[in-house]
Every structure is written in C-alpha cells, then in structure tokens.
C-alpha cells in the first residue's frame, strides 16, 4: 500500500528518478539554491566558475557515497533545528515515537482552532474579544476570563446571550467563510492522515482541504449525532470527519453555549460518562492515539474529560497521545500545562511561543 515513505510506482519516472534522485528533496533544494553558501557544488575551468543547471544531480552522480553522507548530516541538523532540541531535548525521542505510530496508522489527528487560523480564518480568542463591543460587554474583563481562566465556554455563553443566536450564527458564517486559497500546516493533513479526523471546529476548512486534495470525506458525523459510524470507519480505513461539537447551523447537535455544553457533558461541574460526549471521547481516547493540532488544551471540558478518563482507566492502560504546543515563556504557566497534560496522559512536543510556523515544519518531518 503506498505511503508517504513508500510512494506508488510512477511509470513516467526517469531513470535518474528511479535511481534515487530526488529522494532528499530539501537537501537538493539547498544545494541548488545559489544564495546558500554552506554547501556548494561547483565546476571550474581554471579560475572560471561554470554554472551548473542542477548542482544536486552533479553531486548525486559524481560521488554517491559523499552525497548520502552529506544528505544524512543535513537531515539530522534540520531535524534538530525544527524540533528545537537545544531548547527542548525531549522533543527528539517523543517525535520519533510519534512518527513510528503515524507510519503504522495508529494516530488520529484531533484538530483545533489554531489550524484554521493558519489557513486564514480569524484567531478564536481575538474573534470572541472583537465581538465584545457589539455585545456591550467589557473587553478587558473578557480578556482576563479567557487568558487567565480559560473560560471560553462562559465567555461564549455571554456573547451568544447578548447578541442572540441568530445574529451570532449569521456573522460567524461570514467571518469564517472558508478561504479559496488555503495555505499553511492544515494542507499537509490529507497527506499524513488519509483516514478519519476529529475536530472541535465549526468552520469548514478541513472539508475544503481534503476536497482540494481529491480525498474528500466520505461522511461527516457529529458528537451529539450518530457517532457510531465513526467507530466503524476507523478500522475500515474510511475517510470520516467527526465534528465533535457539531455544526453551527444545527442547534440540536451543536455544542456552543453553556446550555449545550451542559446537555453534552453534564451540568453539575462533573464529567458524566453516560452523557454523549464524555461517553464518545472515553471510547476513542482509550482505543486510539491522538495528535492534538491547533489545540490550546486549556482547562475546558474536553481536556477535563481526558483527565478523568486517565484517572479512571489508569495511564498504563491508555495508548500514548501527543500534542504540538507553543511553550509559554512564563515558567509557572508552562508548569501548569505540563501537569495538566501529564494528568491527561498527553505528551507535548514543544516549539517556541508565537512561532507557529514550526507546526507545519514538524508535520513535514512526519511526511519524510
């Protein structure tokens, strides 16, 4: 079966390509870049430098052993740079473990709002804060609730109550209209995960990305809908999208305001596993490895559910879960996140705060 590591045979490939030319794409691009001076392949006649159309090919066919050595060295240095191993030394072993799981098809991506932002949609926190003026709510107070208390559920409830559901829905559909040209890390997902995907997002970025890649989802299900089909799709390798919190235009299956969160998770401050979403998440979390992408993993009901599952089941009985996360510069905040993730049996791969381009680069490493 073709995979990113073992692509399908190309009957139109040249002899050079069949021989292995092009297998080190990033290394070849560096060698062929005239402005990159660390590695140069040159041809000289006396003191005159004769330009080469493809220095990488000259290197490859000129000294295959040296080419392979330098390509391997480049890959190792590039991997260390992307994983920021100087700052986060545990990233290397964690990444290698994650990559093995991805190659074996054991990982399901769990996609949050950050991935839609990389595609051109508004950032979720700033979007909510920008609604405060229209809702006559104190923006500074709401910012504290979001940044200090991670009270997205409560802020959302107050905004929807003040604006009215119909107005909120209409504005959301316009503000989060899927861009025609989607770029960023999210575009790599169809190549990495050609099967089932989970998201808490209301937008339709994932649907568009998979459609653009000619790998459209066979079906979409929601967390409060008929989610049983999603479990059958995973072992079958069918391409299903689980929109955990539903679609914005379907109030019966949506999880948006406090009343809907209570109906989905329970309303007394506890996680109830006889309620739809905790029951669904428990079954998934105990059966498959997740890779959290674009998720803040703040102390909301979803992460609380995972923490409760880990407590009830015992971490030794759970598959490994992973997250690509920006590392807070504040030591106390990082310690709090570390503890929350440990309690939920989620292993972070950190990158520097604010430098979200590393997510795309890490996903690129998984493809190599």
Q: Predicted regions: what is each one?
A:
Residues 208-212, 252-259, 302-306:
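A short secondary-structure junction signal
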Residues 108-111, 199, 292-293:
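Short hydrophobic beta-strand that contains or immediately precedes a catalytic carboxylate
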Residues 216-285:
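Active-site gating loop/helix substructures
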Residues 114-117, 203-205, 247-250, 296-298, ...:
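Short, solvent-exposed loop/turn segments at secondary-structure junctions
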Residues 1-105, 117, 159, 163-165, ...:
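SIR2/sirtuin-family catalytic core signature
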């Amino acid at each position: 079966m073709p995979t990113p590591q073992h692509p399908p045979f190309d009957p139109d490939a040249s002899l050079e390509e069949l021989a292995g030319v092009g297998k080190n794409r990033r290394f070849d691009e560096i060698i062929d870049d005239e402005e990159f001076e660390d590695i140069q392949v040159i041809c000289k006649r006396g003191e005159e430098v004769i330009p080469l159309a493809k220095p990488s090919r000259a290197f490859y066919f000129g000294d295959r052993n040296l080419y392979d050595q330098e390509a391997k060295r480049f890959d190792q240095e590039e991997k260390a740079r992307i994983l920021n191993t100087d700052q986060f030394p545990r990233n290397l072993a964690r990444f290698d473990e994650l990559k093995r799981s991805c190659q074996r098809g054991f990982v399901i991506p769990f996609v949050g709002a950050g991935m839609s932002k990389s595609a051109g949609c508004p950032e979720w926190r700033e979007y909510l804060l920008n609604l405060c003026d229209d809702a006559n709510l104190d923006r500074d107070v709401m910012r504290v609730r979001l940044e200090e208390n991670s009270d997205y559920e409560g802020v959302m409830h107050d905004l929807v109550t003040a604006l009215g559901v119909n107005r909120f829905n209409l504005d959301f559909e316009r503000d989060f209209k899927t861009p025609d040209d989607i770029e960023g890390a999210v575009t790599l997902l169809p190549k990495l995960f050609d099967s089932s995907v989970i998201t808490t997002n209301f937008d339709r970025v994932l649907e568009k990305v998979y459609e653009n890649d000619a790998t459209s989802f066979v079906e979409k299900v929601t967390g409060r809908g008929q989610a049983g089909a999603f479990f059958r799709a995973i072992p079958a390798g069918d391409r299903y999208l689980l929109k955990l919190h539903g679609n914005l235009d379907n109030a019966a299956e949506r999880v948006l305001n406090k009343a809907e969160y209570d109906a989905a998770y329970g309303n007394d401050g506890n996680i109830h596993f006889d309620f739809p979403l905790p029951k669904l998440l428990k079954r998934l979390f105990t059966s498959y490895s997740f890779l959290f992408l674009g998720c803040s993993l703040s102390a909301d009901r979803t992460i609380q559910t995972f923490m409760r599952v880990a407590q009830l089941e015992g971490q030794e009985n759970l598959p490994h879960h992973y997250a690509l996360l920006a590392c807070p510069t504040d030591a106390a905040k990082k310690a709090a996140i570390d503890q929350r993730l440990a309690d939920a049996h989620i292993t972070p791969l950190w990158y520097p705060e604010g430098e979200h381009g590393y997510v795309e680069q890490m996903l690129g490493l998984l493809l190599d």
